């Protein structure tokens, strides 16, 4: 785990509702995206359907980027998950991806749950917890640290009116014992997005990984990304560029040792 968790996401979104797509954690999918959490609005259930809804998602990614760092040594990833949401705003879900940390870790399975909603002024909010599980990892391969860990996260977001429906979101995720049992870490994100004609979306994200002074994982760092997505039928195509803002993030990079990455993905939710 070279970076800090937040899953691959697409760019056509609204901070007021997680439109069933995570992977776009899109479409009720774990999209810790512009509103960094999984902003699940009760408006999803406003059409009179069952108070409980289920969804699933699957996608191919040319790389699995997590908080600015590759989780697959610059290799491709197949990812997918299942989600359940209640009209009250409560949700549960699970998500999985292949990983490559150069040891016995080859799969990541996440479990998450929380509650979110929308205030009368249109501001969306979300709080929850996310657990990262790396089954089959042997302690001898970890250099003495347990890979499994959890985040407690919160996010707020707002989507403005107009044809472009610009969105802004702020998120924070805290873990008392980060990946590898290295110490406290807090992750901050700021996201912006706009919707263009033709089911095209643009997204921009700034992230900051704040490692505690006693955190043995290395120095804190910042990163950013910009991407464009296009919905075609039941599929979403996405092209995103991830880049570092300071040199310290190179500490986290594996693979070809390049801190920047251009990632293509195709995903679907149902």
At which residue positions do the language-model features occur?
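Outer-membrane beta-barrel "beta-signal"
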Residues: 226, 230-235, 241, 256-270
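Short glycine/proline- and aromatic-enriched beta-strand/turn motifs that initiate or cap beta-hairpins
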Residues: 47-100
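Repeated loop/turn-to-beta-strand initiation elements of outer-membrane beta-barrel proteins
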Residues: 54, 88-94, 121-127, 161-170, ...
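Sequence/structural signature of outer-membrane beta-barrel proteins
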Residues: 61-67, 95-103, 120, 132-140, ...
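Residues that define the transmembrane beta-barrel architecture of outer-membrane proteins
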Residues: 52, 74-78, 105-109, 146-152, ...
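Detector for outer-membrane/organellar transmembrane beta-barrel domains
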Residues: 145-215, 219, 241-244
């Amino acid at each position: 785990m070279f970076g800090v968790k937040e899953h691959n996401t697409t760019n056509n979104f609204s901070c007021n509702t997680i439109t069933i797509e995570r992977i776009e954690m899109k479409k009720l999918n774990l999209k810790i995206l512009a509103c960094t959490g999984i902003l699940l609005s009760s408006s999803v259930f406003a059409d009179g359907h069952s108070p409980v809804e289920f969804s699933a998602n699957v996608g191919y990614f040319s790389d699995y980027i997590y908080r600015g760092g590759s989780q697959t040594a610059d290799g491709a990833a197949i990812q997918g998950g299942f989600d359940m949401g209640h009209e009250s705003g409560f949700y549960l879900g699970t998500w999985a991806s292949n990983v490559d940390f150069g040891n016995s870790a080859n799969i990541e399975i996440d479990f998450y749950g929380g509650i979110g909603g929308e205030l009368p002024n249109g501001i969306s909010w979300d709080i929850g917890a996310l657990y990262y599980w790396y089954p089959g990892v042997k302690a001898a391969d970890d250099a003495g640290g347990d890979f499994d860990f959890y985040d407690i996260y919160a996010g707020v977001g707002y989507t403005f009116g107009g044809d472009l429906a610009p969105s802004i979101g702020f998120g924070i995720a805290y873990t008392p014992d980060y990946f590898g049992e290295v110490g406290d870490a807090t992750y901050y994100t700021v996201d912006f997005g706009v919707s263009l004609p033709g089911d095209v979306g643009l997204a921009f994200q700034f992230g900051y990984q704040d490692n505690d002074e006693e955190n043995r994982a290395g120095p804190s760092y910042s990163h950013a990304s910009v991407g464009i997505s296009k919905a075609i039928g039941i599929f979403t195509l996405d092209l995103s560029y991830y880049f570092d803002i300071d040199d310290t993030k190179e500490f986290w990079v594996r693979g070809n040792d390049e801190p920047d990455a251009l990632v293509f993905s195709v995903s679907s939710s149902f």
